From Swiss-Prot:
Biological processes annotated in GO: L-leucine biosynthetic process
Catalysed reactions listed for this entry: (2R,3S)-3-isopropylmalate = (2S)-2-isopropylmalate
EC number: 4.2.1.33
Name of the protein in its database record: 3-isopropylmalate dehydratase small subunit
Organism domain of life: Bacteria
Function of the protein: Catalyzes the isomerization between 2-isopropylmalate and 3-isopropylmalate, via the formation of 2-isopropylmaleate.
The encoding gene: leuD
GO MF: 3-isopropylmalate dehydratase activity
GO cellular component: 3-isopropylmalate dehydratase complex
Amino acid sequence: MKPFTTHTGVIATLNRSNVDTDAIIPKQFLKSIKRTGYGPSAFYDWRYTADGRPDPNFELNHPRFEGRSILVTRNNFGCGSSREHAVWALVQDGYRVIIAPWKEIGEKRLPAFADIFLSNTTKNGMLCIELSETIIDAIFEQTASQPGLQATVDLTVQQLTIHGRIPATYPFQIEEGVREQLINGLDEIALSLKHEADIAAFEARRPTWMDGRD
């Protein structure tokens, strides 16, 4: 897995809440467990017209987002069924970072991302950042008035910098285990191999009757 330390890219905005995994990658593309070829199918039902042409009414098809790699969207992104294909599609469509807001309802704070989706992004080297709705609104406003707006994400110091006419920097918080995993480019297999010696020692001292060897 490619390590993630810093990333600079064009921001694209998707002004929709509760984007579920079926919207990210529809069910007809789930027949394969290969991890390749999903990029063009990301947001398929929104992205294309009935005859398969790019839909000019879908916001991510707008020319001002050409070359985008940072997606800024609304609350509860990645909800719905637990399909890792959704993350594969986003990564293969060029996204390295997704930014969304938590939502305050009374005394409750609703997370920006669905739990399983968030876990799958970490496994695939994608960074998800939670910010307040106020900050997300400001980024939407800047992006609307500044085509090709870029941002830099620095995971080492946990800062997002918007390179607008008036630059702005926002701190963010990432769970330390997730941060370490992304910075070092460790997938689940690599994480296990870090403890290879301990695993081998455990296997060596484990009683043989436990696995039916006696």
